[in-house]
Amino acid sequence: MSLGRLCRLLMPALLCGALAAPGLAGTMCASRDDWRCAGSMHEFSAKVLDGHTVNLDKYRGFVCIVTNVASQUGKTEVNYTQLVDLHARYAECGLRFLAFPCNQFGKQEPGSNEEIKEFAAGYNVKFDMFSKICVNGDDAHPLWKWMKIQPKGKGILGNAIKWNFTKFLFDKNGCVVKRYGPMEEPLVLEKDLPHYF
């Protein structure tokens, strides 16, 4: 095989992170159009509630739980209460939470980012809250599209997010290690956490 042909074959892998240095691939491969080639959550970015864009590489070396949230869901009280409790007990161990408000399920997150921030403050939320996004469909945030196709991020009866408070557990390398359905309360995750610290 010629060197030119070898380069043409390897270039897509290099650009999509399979062989690239950590962090470099994220700037090239986690956009709205080419999210499939990301190697970890660290290659994505998202806007926090105040509108600033955050590179998710900041979570490198931390165990993370990513969830979609809503303020007017029947599961809101138990999920927010337990997420805050887990964060208080495990943040010092290296656990981080990324909460993404979403209005796709029963229109149960209708508020503005400022209203969502005020609502979360009522639960004394100290973990990271991101701007409202879509988690399903063509307009879904690239991170959420990517999570759902990971080997351990796939759902039951299809990969679509079924409801509010679907949770994904990530290891320190930014890889999905488990998906939890919306009926599984956050404390269910606690038994799995020690495997990843």
Swiss-Prot record:
Modified residues (Phosphoserine): 40
Annotated CDD domains: GSH_Peroxidase (cd00340)
Signal sequence segment: none
Protein name: Phospholipid hydroperoxide glutathione peroxidase
EC category name: oxidoreductase
Pfam families recorded: GSHPx (PF00255)
Subunit-level organization: Monomer. Has a tendency to form higher mass oligomers. Interacts with FUNDC1; this interaction promotes GPX4 recruitment into mitochondria through TOM/TIM complex where it is degraded by mitophagy.
Keywords in alphabetical order: Cytoplasm, Developmental protein, Lipid metabolism, Mitochondrion, Oxidoreductase, Peroxidase, Phosphoprotein, Selenocysteine, Transit peptide
EC number: 1.11.1.12, 1.11.1.9
Catalytic activity: a hydroperoxy polyunsaturated fatty acid + 2 glutathione = a hydroxy polyunsaturated fatty acid + glutathione disulfide + H2O; 2 glutathione + H2O2 = glutathione disulfide + 2 H2O; tert-butyl hydroperoxide + 2 glutathione = tert-butanol + glutathione disulfide + H2O; cumene hydroperoxide + 2 glutathione = 2-phenylpropan-2-ol + glutathione disulfide + H2O
A GO molecular-function descriptor: phospholipid-hydroperoxide glutathione peroxidase activity
